[in-house]
């Protein structure tokens, strides 16, 4: 792990624009000259003191609260100064420029959190949870991010790593005593522990999957032929008029994106142009974009007109078969048929009316079910795709280890356990390369 920079960094920690309060944050190993020049004298550590923030001539740029946190008991583990002044962009810019005059460097996005990680104040999963908490779009996603920030996810990972260390110690002993008349791999306890570890990995995978859904949401693409009610369905799911609805085929020519909640699950809906052959170059471009959106969907809603049951597949033939598809027969208000949900050849079929709303709740429930989301699941923490990948690689390695235990191949068993431990270490940052760190922290906002 690289040592943190020793220079002093500064940034505005509040969002751009006007507000009642604006904050400038400073962190570094030597803040003495900055404290003297900006405040006249250092404030008492961990006390909120009203101060004037001074320019180079000793005149007040602004007045407000100064908070000083000496190292190591601070967010970054370094000396930290926060200046809470008025939230106008001009006064904040003047204050920021003053800190730069005093030798501070403008912080990179996420650099305060990066220093906290590098100084051991939090691990990588907790650092990522800060960004997830800021970006959360639902109450459930905010609560799951807070659990990760408090260390619940990391505690699960550390427990699994401790189990792996114990197993590795036992297996290494079996290798060391391989020339003796002792077969430690015959101990049934070892097999029980590996099986128990697999069960725990399955449990944490389930929770991490829920957390990833809350963080990232589900990209759901509405597709179908022109004039089957795709835009009406978007409006019905959103509960308000978002898309223009007319009887003229081809009204939607570009992608229309909307984010909303369905039972606490963030849903990113994409309404697309009707899929058909067209001579109109603008409509053709919209259809091309629709096909691109379909290829990247987490779930597809294929809308058909309930009056024309033969109006079947309008989907590109080259779509991945792994993308879940829900077939929707819309406009049952024109046929007199009731709303219903059935499963035909492993495909969910829903009859509904986007205009009246009849059957739309069936669709909402099916989207949640197909996503594998369980509202109100206790102990769910924020997770990312890289976390899921690491957990699943660890599980695969432990499953291989169980096979090698049965064949009593101790060296390969030990190697698989080591690989599992390394995969889990990537989550908390114990085994992480510099490129990954740069990608993670560069996605943070300035001042965090």
UniProtKB/Swiss-Prot annotation:
Stored Pfam families: MMR_HSR1, MnmE_helical, TrmE_N
Protein name from the UniProt record: tRNA modification GTPase MnmE
Function: Exhibits a very high intrinsic GTPase hydrolysis rate. Involved in the addition of a carboxymethylaminomethyl (cmnm) group at the wobble position (U34) of certain tRNAs, forming tRNA-cmnm(5)s(2)U34.
InterPro entries given in the database record: G_TrmE (IPR031168), GTP-bd (IPR006073), GTP-bd_TrmE_N (IPR018948), GTPase_MnmE (IPR004520), MnmE_dom2 (IPR027368), MnmE_helical (IPR025867), P-loop_NTPase (IPR027417), Small_GTP-bd (IPR005225)
Annotated GO CC locations: cytosol
Binding residue positions for K(+): 227, 246, 248, 251
Gene it is expressed from: mnmE
Cofactor: K(+)
PROSITE patterns for this protein: G_TRME (PS51709)
Similarity remark: Belongs to the TRAFAC class TrmE-Era-EngA-EngB-Septin-like GTPase superfamily. TrmE GTPase family.
Chain positions recorded as (6S)-5-formyl-5,6,7,8-tetrahydrofolate binding sites: 25, 82, 121, 448
Enzyme Commission designation: 3.6.-.-
Binding positions for GTP per the UniProt entry: 227-232, 246-252, 271-274, 353-355
Localization of this protein: Cytoplasm
Cleavable signal peptide: none
Native source organism of the sequence: Methylococcus capsulatus (strain ATCC 33009 / NCIMB 11132 / Bath)
Any GO MF annotation of the entry: GTP binding
